Design a protein with these regions (language model features):
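Accessory terminal alpha-helical modules
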Residues: 2-243
Length: 243
């Protein structure tokens, strides 16, 4: 359209401005208008009431749930204490659902499948579950960062989620984790000594499988890695293997 045509254009544009009175109302408006303006599924799901509850609860513990991208950054909250939705999903998937391989292999897809989403974000779970899962992963990351071996450093992401699951299962003395058990875990009990002992088992299984399967990334994403770790946890419970 030329400048002259634009000047003679008599069409009008109707703009409707809605001022929401609350976050809940704002999110209902966004969801209702999603057919006109496409919003990613993960972003839409993060507007559900359970995510608002998680956000409010975690903030009481100085953890800032970033269910709206960059929201916590814009509030000036510390980066290390800002928890993206995807990160929380990976933490719960790895620990509660005992699927650390999926946390490693497909982090961007955990909120796309209804079955996975419903298992991760369940309104019947105690909110402390989410806090504990975050703290366990943060503790695992800090532990792995302290390990000086360069081979370990290059494979942190291949063993991080698995070590978190293993350390939690061993501390709670079960390979069948339940939400309320995890919620009651005192994260301070996951000491450096505990991580040392658990890591020796995880790393042994990881190393053996790397020899069998060929590449570390393949091991980190494999079902077999999880299967062998859970079997080892059961052996520890039965007294067949000592920590």
């Amino acid at each position: 359209m030329s400048d002259d045509q634009r000047r003679r254009d008599a069409r009008d544009v109707l703009v409707r401005i809605i001022v929401p009175r609350s976050d809940e109302e704002r999110e209902r408006v966004i969801e209702a208008t999603n057919s006109q303006t496409v919003v990613p599924l993960a972003s839409l799901r993060a507007m559900a009431p359970i995510h608002r509850r998680i956000e409010t609860f975690l903030e009481l513990h100085e953890l800032y749930y970033d269910r709206k991208k960059n929201y916590q950054k814009n509030r000036g909250k510390p980066r290390d204490s800002t928890i993206p939705v995807g990160y929380l999903s990976q933490a719960v998937m790895a620990i509660l659902l005992r699927r650390p391989n999926d946390s490693r292999a497909r982090p961007s897809n955990l909120l796309k499948e209804d079955a996975d989403y419903d298992e991760i974000f369940n309104s019947e779970y105690p909110l402390d579950l989410y806090r504990v899962c975050i703290r366990v992963i943060k503790g695992t990351e800090a532990y792995l960062k302290s390990v000086s071996d360069p081979i370990v450093q290059s494979n942190k992401n291949n063993v991080k989620w698995h070590l978190a699951m293993f350390a939690t299962c061993v501390k709670l003395q079960t390979s069948r984790l339940r939400a309320h058990h995890i919620a009651e875990l005192a994260v301070s009990d996951l000491t450096i000594d505990h991580f040392d002992l658990c890591f020796s088992h995880v790393w042994q299984v990881f190393s053996d499988l790397t020899t069998e399967l060929g590449t570390p990334d393949r091991v980190g994403k494999s079902n077999e890695f999880v299967t062998r770790l859970l079997s080892r946890i059961r052996d520890i419970q039965a007294g067949g293997i000592t920590l």
